[in-house]
């Protein structure tokens, strides 16, 4: 590390100048990789480990990081600190070796908190919408010339990265409640998009515990900070009297401080008016579909308005918003073989949503923008515990599509739970009599099993948080045409 780099480090986090080499266990995850990318650009020596290469590790390698595709004790040699993902178990060889060598082992959010410590932090939390809202806030600040640093849980498509080092005082970050580690953060502004029961193993199955944790997160704001909260959400409305900080509310509700009105969706764009107290109305064209994205935009506008950002910059950023990876991600429209003598096409959309509320929002956006298309969903449930806990909600939401193909549950390290598997979920949906789901036990057969379902005027939603995104990209590569010998590597 040269003198110029050290000077830059001192100007950002003065006491972290003692740190030279930062090692990340699980560096290929979007959240971990984003922080590693910012630190690499700040001049730190970065290394990390994961099980396989991916776009995140490729980007980090291009920045000079050393990536190991294994977990071995020697990987942490000479590290000043080890940053660990919540997905990594305590008996990981690198974690054990770090403890034995008396190297500090910290969670991802603790490192993010250090990045935020000497900046104007804007943290975006909530069960749904965090990634997109983070990208919207970042886009507005960038359009206004404020050059923010951002760390996001998904790819910000306009920038082509999950994270970017800016040169201003602003740091915009997604705040993760899944392991309660967002309590490490001490932002100046916090957005809470909504609060629902998810990741309940972290909260010992106690929803009151989850709600109190969000309150504790908001109490990390200084008394002169601001909480921006969606008043449409019944849990947030219930918690507002307990926040104890300055608040700005947003939503479709008439009592919202920033109110969405006259929403209309035309294809992939939303058109609506934002009413702000004491400010001119904003007539917004948002390049993202769905009422849920109008709410995300309202949150971003509330923050930008409080900062004094020019309305023209806000409107330009939202109209040109390119979205985030795997959030209603349009992968193409492909010609199909003629059906009943008529040629047709199918649109392919990839979406990360894996909670019933998220899936419902995606379906509604698809119906609103393309009402005449047959809606075909390829769904992969994520985690047996989530499938068990939200079983009826999944069954209710998934019956809204015209045709459903379902992959096996993506376990994310969990053991199977009887009755919380895809076969059982398909049976429950079938018994309701609205649609007849197709169980796809072999991912390599997706294109073959999808073909007879298509009519030539279709919108295919590939939905889920596991490896189903790889299948979506594979379907795009082969233009939805079944291959004679479909490769299994995409599954």
Swiss-Prot record:
Gene Ontology MF term list: ATP binding; UDP-N-acetylmuramate-L-alanine ligase activity
InterPro entries, per database record: Mur-like_cat_sf, Mur_ligase_C, Mur_ligase_C_dom_sf, Mur_ligase_cen, Mur_ligase_N, MurCDEF_pg_biosynth, UDP-N-AcMur_Ala_ligase_MurC
Enzyme Commission no: 6.3.2.8
Keywords, comma-separated and alphabetical: ATP-binding, Cell cycle, Cell division, Cell shape, Cell wall biogenesis/degradation, Cytoplasm, Ligase, Nucleotide-binding, Peptidoglycan synthesis
Pathway: Cell wall biogenesis; peptidoglycan biosynthesis
Single GO cellular component term: cytoplasm
Nucleotide-binding keyword on record: yes
Subcellular location: Cytoplasm
Entry keyword annotation includes Cell division: yes
Cystine connections: none
Gene3D superfamilies per the UniProt record, alphabetical: Mur ligase, C-terminal domain, Mur-like, catalytic domain, NAD(P)-binding Rossmann-like Domain
Catalytic activity: UDP-N-acetyl-alpha-D-muramate + L-alanine + ATP = UDP-N-acetyl-alpha-D-muramoyl-L-alanine + ADP + phosphate + H(+)
Residues annotated to bind ATP: 126-132
Pfam family, one: Mur_ligase
Biological process annotations from GO: cell division; cell wall organization; peptidoglycan biosynthetic process; regulation of cell shape
Family statement: Belongs to the MurCDEF family.
Function (record text): Cell wall formation.
UniProt cross-references to HAMAP family, sorted A to Z: MurC (MF_00046)
Name the record gives this protein: UDP-N-acetylmuramate--L-alanine ligase
Species this protein is from: Salmonella paratyphi C (strain RKS4594)
Lineage, top ranks: Bacteria, Pseudomonadati, Pseudomonadota, Gammaproteobacteria, Enterobacterales
Gene: murC
